[in-house]
């Protein structure tokens, strides 16, 4: 373990200025994102008194853009400079976020306003995420894709660990809408860090093909790649279930268990400790299991352990411990899974197709999330939060088991290059 951690911090990527700027910016943005996500839930639940169904709609709007423009965004990004796309998306996020505290100060904040901002942030996220995932192979080289993704995933986990706790503390001091100011400041730093990247970016490939033709080419590539398409289907199913779980957990904690927003933030923060450990130890799992079995094993364990969380309603005295421990274990395994499957996709995809491939997978993940969010809100209203959580966790476990039947699950080594047809 000590050797793994030491090697992680002394990797050649730490001498790559472009990657370090991207990494620093992403770390700040992830902290802000987590604070903003918690603040959004607190505003909807505590300030605007939204119902379970309205909360589901609000969560759905945050990812609706992936369903609407997810596929064309990939084709567009393939023809644009990725760094410029990320900067413009960051500036747009800042403007949208600042509107919330301004509306609150002038007593004009409504649920409709919050929903519009959620939708705009989702649109910015579409373009930023597609560009950022396509930018990593440009600045990190294919040799270090897995290491780069591991560090960026660690940034996500640092944000997930520190963001909710910081957000919960801030919610105890300020009104939820004012906490959005911190999120805006983190995006200011993130945008500045990306702007500081000086590494020349290759000119994007431009073709005379129409947008529809480019989208079809991307879809045909994913559909015809024997490793990608089965993985695509399983990831889409898992994302639907995960979106439902993410909507239901805050309701379980804040309403069913009657905890405070501060307690919710701390519980989410503790859970992310497992994610940081997962990013640090992923290479050991890869050496022992290979790519395929690492994806399957970590995915199944990571979602199955979440079944402990709804049982917390039957043990109020131990509820916080149950949610925290299951969150740590789940985050550990799902971080290893996420980094491994993302690195596999980037490794086997040709450079001119990265934007479209990433957009198609983002479409699969984020595009179905509005449906999962909405379905979970309706399910909770009909059968109760606890029962709804069991249903969505079972769906996630089923999707993970299905991954074991895909060709990707049979990759035994630590690289997929020799398996590309």
Describe every region a protein language model picked out:
Residues 2-20, 199-233, 421:
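Juxtamembrane intracellular "pre-TM" segments in multi-pass secondary transporters
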Residues 3, 67-71, 75, 79, ...:
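C-terminal transmembrane bundle of multi-pass solute transporters/carriers
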Residues 10-42, 46, 119, 223-244, ...:
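Pair of pore-lining "gating" transmembrane helices in MFS-fold secondary transporters
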Residues 27, 109-127, 236, 319-336:
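Hydrophobic core of transmembrane alpha-helices in multi-pass small-molecule transporters
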Residues 36, 49-56, 150, 261-268, ...:
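Small-residue hotspots at the loop-to-helix junctions and early N-terminal turns
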Residues 39-53, 247-262:
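Short amphipathic helix-loop junctions that connect adjacent transmembrane helices
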Residues 111-122, 144-202, 269, 321-324, ...:
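Hydrophobic alpha-helical transmembrane segments
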């Amino acid at each position: 373990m000590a050797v793994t951690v030491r090697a992680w911090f002394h990797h050649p990527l730490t001498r790559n200025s472009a990657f370090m700027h991207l990494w620093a910016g992403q770390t700040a943005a992830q902290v802000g994102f987590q604070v903003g996500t918690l603040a959004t839930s607190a505003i909807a639940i505590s300030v605007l008194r939204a119902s379970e169904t309205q909360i589901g709609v609000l969560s759905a709007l945050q990812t609706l853009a992936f369903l609407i423009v997810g596929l064309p965004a990939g084709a567009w990004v393939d023809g644009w400079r990725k760094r410029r796309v990320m900067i413009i998306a960051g500036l747009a996020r800042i403007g949208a976020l600042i509107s919330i505290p301004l509306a609150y100060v002038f007593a004009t904040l409504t649920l409709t306003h919050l929903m519009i901002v959620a939708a705009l942030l989702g649109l910015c996220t579409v373009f930023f995420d597609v560009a950022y995932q396509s930018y990593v192979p440009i600045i990190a080289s294919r040799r270090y894709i897995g290491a780069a993704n591991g560090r960026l995933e660690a940034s996500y986990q640092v944000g997930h660990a520190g963001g909710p706790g910081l957000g919960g503390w801030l919610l105890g001091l300020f009104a939820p809408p004012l906490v959005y100011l911190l999120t805006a400041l983190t995006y200011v730093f993130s945008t500045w860090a990306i702007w500081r990247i000086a590494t020349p970016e290759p000119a994007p490939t431009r073709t005379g093909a129409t947008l529809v033709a480019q989208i079809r080419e991307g879809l045909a590539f994913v559909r015809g790649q024997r490793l990608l398409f089965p993985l695509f289907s399983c990831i889409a199913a898992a994302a639907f279930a995960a979106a439902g779980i993410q909507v239901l957990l805050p309701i379980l904690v804040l309403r069913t268990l009657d905890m405070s927003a501060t307690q919710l933030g701390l519980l989410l923060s503790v859970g992310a400790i497992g994610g940081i450990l997962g990013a640090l130890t992923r290479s050991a799992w890869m050496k022992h299991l290979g790519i395929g079995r690492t994806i399957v094993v970590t995915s199944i364990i990571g979602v199955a352990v979440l079944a402990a969380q709804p049982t917390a309603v039957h043990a109020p005295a131990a509820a916080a411990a149950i949610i925290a421990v299951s969150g740590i274990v789940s985050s550990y395994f799902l971080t290893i899974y996420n980094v491994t499957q993302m690195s596999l996709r980037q490794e086997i995809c040709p450079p001119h197709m990265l934007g479209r491939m990433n957009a198609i997978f983002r479409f699969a993940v984020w595009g179905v999330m509005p449906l999962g969010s909405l379905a979970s809100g309706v399910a909770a209203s009909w059968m109760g939060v606890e029962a709804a959580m069991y249903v969505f966790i079972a769906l996630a476990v089923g999707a993970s088991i299905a991954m074991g039947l895909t060709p990707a699950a049979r990759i035994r080594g630590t690289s997929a290059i020799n398996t590309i047809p």
